[in-house]
UniProtKB/Swiss-Prot annotation:
One of its GO terms (cellular component) is cytosol. It holds the Pfam family OTCace. L-aspartate binds at residues 85, 168, 229. PROSITE patterns: CARBAMOYLTRANSFERASE (PS00097). Pathway: Pyrimidine metabolism; UMP biosynthesis via de novo pathway; (S)-dihydroorotate from bicarbonate: step 2/3. GO terms for molecular function: amino acid binding; aspartate carbamoyltransferase activity. This is Aspartate carbamoyltransferase catalytic subunit. It catalyses: carbamoyl phosphate + L-aspartate = N-carbamoyl-L-aspartate + phosphate + H(+). GO terms for biological process: 'de novo' pyrimidine nucleobase biosynthetic process; 'de novo' UMP biosynthetic process; amino acid metabolic process. The gene is pyrB. Belongs to the aspartate/ornithine carbamoyltransferase superfamily. ATCase family.
Amino acid sequence: MKNSLYQRHIISISDLNREELEMVVKVAGDLKRTPRHELLKNKVVASCFFEASTRTRLSFETAVQRLGGTVIGFSDGGNTSLAKKGETLADSVQIITSYVDAYVMRHPQEGAARLASMFSNGKPVINGGDGSNQHPTQTLLDLFSIYETQGRLDGLKVAFVGDLKYGRTVHSLAQALSLFGCRFYFIAPEALAMPEYICEELDDKGIEYSLHTSIEEVVGELDILYMTRVQKERFDETEFKHMKSKFVLNVDTLKGAQDNLRILHPLPRVDEIAIEVDHTPYAYYFQQAENGVYAREALLALVLNETI
């Protein structure tokens, strides 16, 4: 297999083309079926989280260890020299990358991962989320989960629900799935609609999409229902209660759904998916979170091995 991801920075999902996305999905499936504990032997990966994280950090660190590698790093950026002594991000990255083979980071500042890649001593930087900008490895695990449940990525009907304006996961996933000719349904309050630049990109590619204000309008057409949280703090109490009734998923909402429908969510869930939905055959968000390990194993293996 030709591996064009070897020694590559992974900053934005748009850094990867269709063939590279398919390669990560394939390798993730291979590693899920047949674990390989030697792919990161004698490799050290920095896990540097300047912002709180549970699933992303733990799944990355699990991925490194399952592949036979070693992890160093921190999960509280407030206790680093950068925070305590005024060290610049550029200096911090330059020093830490001199110790390791790859540098995984999360940072609250948009563009921090791209900046880090400029000072990484040529070591690959993997973006674990930079502010509201990009979260490419979430998109990779989403793609793997979609492929796992549908057997394909091409031509699917996918709805995004909730906070589409600020949600970095939906922006990246829409961009990635547009490479596979998917049809999109954007279900959100007007104040949290999908950003214009995403819609313009889809228009330029000839991708079909439509805007909706309730899940019930389209649930019977969908292959994938991608839920996100509508943040209460963005609305007054009366408006939020009205929004909540339209953008909370329960069993009744799923009446008429196709058998192959699967519900995804980047998590954490608050109250936008009723607990009762967990027990339906449509729920796939916990398996999706587990798939984060395999998608990140695949990415690390490809970035750190010329051939696998």
